[in-house]
């Protein structure tokens, strides 16, 4: 059986993932935690084969940073990064960390357990791009990376033209 560590701060999402693992004949839940900072410790304490890691976890811990550290000392552990945020930069950041897959919780057309199976069979599983969402009257696919940067700055309350543009 494949030992799975779930790192997810949302109790509802964690329960749903645990339920899928329990129904599987291939996977068993090793542990389920809400903070990425504890993922390293959990991996050192036992035999973890697969980690399902949220991008942002409890106490604002970065799943990407934790994944990169884990991959440094144990590259054999497979890691799938998950998020419900349709942010396009997460895919590239996940690849840069050496993770094996990426899954959009709310937008993915591929079921989580299918992504797990493919990753455990040696495949790297990534969506081609972030899902398109509506921003006002526009579709997110219509914006450039620079335009998204400007929108983020404005959304954070920055009004100084020099700091935004």
Q: What are the functions of these language-model segments?
A:
Residues 8:
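Conserved acidic carboxylate
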Residues 134-165:
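Helix-turn-helix DNA-binding segment
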Residues 11-31:
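Two-component/phosphorelay signaling modules centered on CheY-like receiver
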Residues 32-50, 58:
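Acidic, metal-coordinating helix/loop segments flanking the phosphotransfer/catalytic sites
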Residues 54-56, 83:
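Active-site residues of response regulator receiver
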Residues 64-76:
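Short amphipathic alpha-helix used as the core "switch/output" element in two-component signaling
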Residues 89, 107-116:
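C-terminal output helix
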């Amino acid at each position: 059986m494949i030992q799975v560590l779930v790192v997810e701060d949302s109790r509802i999402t964690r329960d749903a993932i645990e339920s899928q693992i329990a129904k599987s004949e291939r996977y068993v839940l090793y542990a389920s935690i809400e903070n990425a900072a504890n993922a390293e410790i959990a991996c050192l304490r036992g035999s973890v084969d697969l980690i399902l890691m949220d991008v942002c976890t409890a106490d604002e811990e970065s799943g990407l940073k934790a994944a990169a550290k884990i991959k440094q000392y144990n590259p054999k552990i497979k890691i799938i990064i998950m998020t419900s945020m349709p942010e396009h930069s997460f895919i590239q950041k996940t690849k840069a960390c050496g993770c094996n897959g990426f899954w959009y919780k709310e937008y993915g057309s591929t079921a989580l357990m299918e992504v797990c199976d493919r990753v455990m069979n040696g495949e790297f599983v990534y969506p081609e791009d972030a899902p398109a969402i509506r921003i006002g009257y526009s579709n997110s696919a219509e914006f450039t990376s620079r335009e998204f940067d400007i929108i983020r700055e404005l959304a954070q309350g920055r009004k100084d033209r020099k700091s935004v543009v």
